C-alpha cells in the first residue's frame, strides 16, 4: 500500500526533487525561445501523472491482449476522435511514443528496405528522420534530397524533376528549421504523378495547422505524422493521421510492428491537449504565436541580423549570425547567460560544423504561452541583439538579465 501523505517525491527522492525544482525555476526565470519547446497545461500534466501509467493495454480499443482495459479504451478512443476532428482526418493513431517513432512506423508500414525516399535536405532545414545517413531512414533506404532555391524557399521545380528522375516510393514534406508555408498540394500532385506515397511531417506546425493559421496537409497526404508537444502544446509523444487506404498498414506497423504496450497516461495527456486545441482560445493563441514570430523577425532584421528566407510565415525563424561575426554555439551560450534560451542551428549550406553552426533557431510558442504579445516580442528581440552586439560586455549581460527577470515576473508560466 502507498501512503500519499508520507510517500511524497520529496520524501522518497530528495535529489530528483531538487533537480525538478531547479528546472521549474529555470523555466519560470528564463525566456524560452527553442522552437520545439512549449509549456503544457496543468490539466495535461495531471493526466500524465495519473494511475493510467499502471495499465498495460497492448492492441487497440476493443481489441486488447490484456483484460481490464475498458476504461483506458475510453481514453484512447477520445484521443483518436479528437485528433480526427482537430485535423479533419479519416483515421488517427495516438500510440506513437515520439515523432521519430511515428515516422519509423510509416516507413515500416509502407516501404521495403532499399526503396527510394525523398525528403528535404538536413543541411537546408530537413529533419534527421527524413533520410540523414546516420539515421535509420538513411541506412535502410535510398535517399534523394531536395533543397532550397536562391530565395531560400523550397525548390519545388527541382523537387519535381528529382521525383520524375528517381521515382521514389515515398515523398516527404516537412522540416525542423523552415519558416515559410509549404505548398502541400504541389507535393501531392508530384507524388501522384510518379506513383509515390505522400507523407507530411508536420511536427513543427501542428498547432498552427489545428488553428487554421498554416496550411493543412491532411486533405493532400496519404499519411501525416507529428509530435504532440511543440506548437500543439501537449505531452511529449507522437501522432499519425492517415487515409483509409493505408490505415491498416500503419496501425499494424505501430503495433505489433515497432511498439508493444502504449503509454496510456501519455495518451490521456494527448486527449486533453486535443480537447484544449479544439477551443476558440487555442486559435487566438496560435494567431499570436505567428504575430510574435513576425515581430521578432522584423526587429532582428532592423538590428542588422539576417533572417533565413527573409521572413517567417510560422512560429520559427533561422537567424544567420555571420553579419555579427559570431557562431551559433557562441550565441547560444551568451544568450543562455542572459537567461534567454535558444539553440544553435545550421543555416542552409552552413560552412561551420554541426556542433558550431553559423546560426540560431528561434521560436515563439513558449513565449506566447506566457502571455507575450508583440510588445514583449519586440523587446525580447532587441535584448537578443543587444547581447550579440556586445558579446564581451558584462554590463550589457547584467542589464539584459535584469530585464528578462522583470519580464518573466510580469508573465509567469504557471500562477
From Swiss-Prot:
(6S)-5,6,7,8-tetrahydrofolate binds at residues 122, 126-128. Its EC number is 2.1.2.1. Keywords: Amino-acid biosynthesis, Cytoplasm, One-carbon metabolism, Pyridoxal phosphate, Transferase. Pathway: One-carbon metabolism; tetrahydrofolate interconversion; Amino-acid biosynthesis; glycine biosynthesis; glycine from L-serine: step 1/1. One of its GO terms (cellular component) is cytosol. One of its GO terms (molecular function) is pyridoxal phosphate binding. It holds the Pfam family SHMT. It catalyses: (6R)-5,10-methylene-5,6,7,8-tetrahydrofolate + glycine + H2O = (6S)-5,6,7,8-tetrahydrofolate + L-serine. InterPro entries: PyrdxlP-dep_Trfase (IPR015424), PyrdxlP-dep_Trfase_major (IPR015421), PyrdxlP-dep_Trfase_small (IPR015422), Ser_HO-MeTrfase (IPR001085), Ser_HO-MeTrfase-like (IPR049943), Ser_HO-MeTrfase_PLP_BS (IPR019798), SHMT-like_dom (IPR039429). The modification N6-(pyridoxal phosphate)lysine is found at residue 230. It is found in: Cytoplasm. The keyword Cytoplasm applies. Coiled coil: none annotated. The record marks 229 as: Plays an important role in substrate specificity. Catalyzes the reversible interconversion of serine and glycine with tetrahydrofolate (THF) serving as the one-carbon carrier. This reaction serves as the major source of one-carbon groups required for the biosynthesis of purines, thymidylate, methionine, and other important biomolecules. Also exhibits THF-independent aldolase activity toward beta-hydroxyamino acids, producing glycine and aldehydes, via a retro-aldol mechanism. HAMAP family: SHMT. Belongs to the SHMT family. This is Serine hydroxymethyltransferase. It comes from Leptothrix cholodnii (strain ATCC 51168 / LMG 8142 / SP-6). The lineage of its organism: Bacteria, Pseudomonadati, Pseudomonadota, Betaproteobacteria, Burkholderiales.
Amino acid at each position: 500500500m502507498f501512503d500519499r501523505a508520507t510517500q511524497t517525491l520529496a520524501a522518497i527522492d530528495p535529489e530528483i526533487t531538487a533537480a525538478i525544482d531547479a528546472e521549474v525555476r529555470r523555466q519560470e526565470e528564463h525566456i524560452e525561445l527553442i522552437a520545439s519547446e512549449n509549456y503544457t497545461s496543468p490539466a495535461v500534466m495531471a493526466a500524465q501523472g495519473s494511475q493510467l501509467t499502471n495499465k498495460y493495454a497492448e492492441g487497440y480499443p476493443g481489441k486488447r491482449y490484456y483484460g481490464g482495459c475498458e476504461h483506458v479504451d475510453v481514453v484512447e478512443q477520445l484521443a483518436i476522435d479528437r485528433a480526427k476532428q482537430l485535423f479533419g482526418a479519416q483515421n488517427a493513431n495516438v500510440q506513437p511514443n515520439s515523432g521519430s517513432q511515428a515516422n519509423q512506423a510509416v516507413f515500416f508500414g509502407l516501404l521495403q528496405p532499399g526503396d527510394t525516399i525523398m525528403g528535404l535536405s538536413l543541411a537546408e532545414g530537413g529533419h534527421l528522420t527524413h533520410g540523414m545517413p546516420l539515421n535509420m531512414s538513411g541506412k535502410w533506404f535510398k535517399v534523394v534530397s531536395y533543397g532550397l532555391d536562391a530565395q531560400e524557399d523550397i525548390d519545388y521545380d527541382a523537387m519535381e524533376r528529382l521525383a520524375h528522375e528517381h521515382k521514389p516510393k515515398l515523398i516527404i514534406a516537412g522540416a525542423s528549421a523552415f519558416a515559410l508555408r509549404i505548398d502541400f498540394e504541389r507535393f501531392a500532385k508530384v507524388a501522384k504523378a510518379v506513383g509515390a506515397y505522400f507523407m507530411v511531417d508536420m511536427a513543427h506546425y501542428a498547432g498552427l495547422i489545428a488553428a487554421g493559421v498554416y496550411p493543412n496537409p491532411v486533405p493532400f497526404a496519404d499519411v501525416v505524422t507529428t509530435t504532440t508537444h511543440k506548437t500543439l502544446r501537449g505531452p511529449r509523444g507522437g501522432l499519425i493521421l492517415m487515409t483509409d487506404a493505408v490505415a491498416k498498414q500503419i496501425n499494424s506497423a505501430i503495433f505489433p510492428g515497432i511498439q508493444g504496450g502504449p503509454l496510456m497516461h501519455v495518451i490521456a495527456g494527448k486527449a486533453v491537449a486535443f480537447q484544449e486545441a479544439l477551443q476558440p482560445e487555442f486559435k487566438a493563441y496560435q494567431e499570436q504565436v505567428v504575430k510574435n514570430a513576425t515581430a521578432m523577425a522584423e526587429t532582428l532584421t532592423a538590428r542588422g541580423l539576417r533572417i533565413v528566407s527573409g521572413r517567417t510565415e510560422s512560429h520559427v525563424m533561422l537567424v544567420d549570425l555571420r553579419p555579427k561575426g559570431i557562431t551559433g554555439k557562441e550565441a547560444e551560450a551568451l544568450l543562455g547567460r542572459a537567461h534567454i534560451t535558444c539553440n544553435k542551428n545550421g543555416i542552409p549550406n552552413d560552412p561551420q560544423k554541426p556542433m558550431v553552426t553559423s546560426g540560431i533557431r528561434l521560436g515563439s510558442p513558449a513565449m506566447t504561452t506566457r502571455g507575450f504579445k508583440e510588445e514583449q516580442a519586440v523587446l525580447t528581440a532587441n535584448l537578443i541583439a543587444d547581447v550579440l552586439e556586445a558579446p564581451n560586455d558584462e554590463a550589457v549581460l547584467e542589464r539584459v538579465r535584469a530585464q528578462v527577470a522583470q519580464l518573466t515576473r510580469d508573465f509567469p508560466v504557471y500562477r
